[in-house]
Swiss-Prot record:
Function: Glycerol-3-phosphate phosphatase hydrolyzing glycerol-3-phosphate into glycerol. Thereby, regulates the cellular levels of glycerol-3-phosphate a metabolic intermediate of glucose, lipid and energy metabolism. Was also shown to have a 2-phosphoglycolate phosphatase activity and a tyrosine-protein phosphatase activity. However, their physiological relevance is unclear. In vitro, also has a phosphatase activity toward ADP, ATP, GDP and GTP.
Gene name per UniProt: PGP
PANTHER family membership: 4-NITROPHENYLPHOSPHATASE-RELATED, GLYCEROL-3-PHOSPHATE PHOSPHATASE
Enzyme Commission number: 3.1.3.21, 3.1.3.48
One biological process term in Gene Ontology: negative regulation of gluconeogenesis
Residues flagged as site, Important for substrate specificity: L204
Protein name: Glycerol-3-phosphate phosphatase
Cofactor(s) the protein needs: Mg(2+)
Amino acid sequence: MAEAEAGGDDGRCVRLNAERAQALLADVDTLLFDCDGVLWRGETAVPGAPETLTALRARGKRLAFITNNSSKTREAYAEKLRCLGFGAPAGPDAGREVFGTAYCTALYLRQRLTGPPAPKAYVLGSVALAAELEAVGVSCVGVGPEPLLGDGPGAWLDAPLEPDVRAVVVGFDPHFSYMKLTKAVRYLQQPDCLLVGTNMDNRLPLENGRFIAGTGCLVRAVEMAAQRQADIIGKPSRFIFDCVSQEYGIHPERTVMVGDRLDTDILLGVTCGLKTILTLTGVSSLRDVKSNQESDCMAKKKMVPDFYVDSIADLLPALQG
């Protein structure tokens, strides 16, 4: 789609050429980056992305990484950033730039699960998610494979439950199973038991245009079975931005959100009053933007970025000039 086709009557979603990028960066202190589909695909860095972030750091820009992926701790994400050449801090400061949904879910539960009994969560998710929860004092059960017990529904419902579970947390879980779903619903029959989803992404992009089902598919399954609506931590929820803002002291008008998804990254930026850049190396396309611009739905009209780039490497000329 040509540049002329991308911009709407309101001047949003224009190609961020070198001249526009220089003007934008002059008014910006902080850049918030999504990771999957923006900085890398799977285990491969987007060409030119490491050099772009190195140049931004050299210009004195503050960087933070906001990911809906709950499969790694902050420290593990920092290690991946370093291994792929993005220059994240090491040592005691490792992970301080990273705001993943595992970490932010832990902050949320620490706020909500006050008082006795001691906080405990049934976790449909990764070891990393459980590690972040346990780091703030929330004990975890349920991580890992959980096959069906018995030979029918009666036996499944008789499977023992842990006492005093105060939250069901749904993240990315390759071991998601009918047994786990059944247990989650049983815990959620207690009205005071929280249902928390790390994010609602429907798919996770990998290399060569491939993708896998995202966490949102699992959250929806639990919501439907339990007839409950989950509290969502990740983008576009404002909670994850508030986590960054509290630690970084962000001024929204001098902050840019860079992402590849209109319904998470760009919507978060618009909702929080940030400047927004869509990169076309991930999920959303200019065709999606145009569809939103032409929609009669006001919610879709909000999911339009200020600028777009083919890749964040398109920022390099402005940084080298």
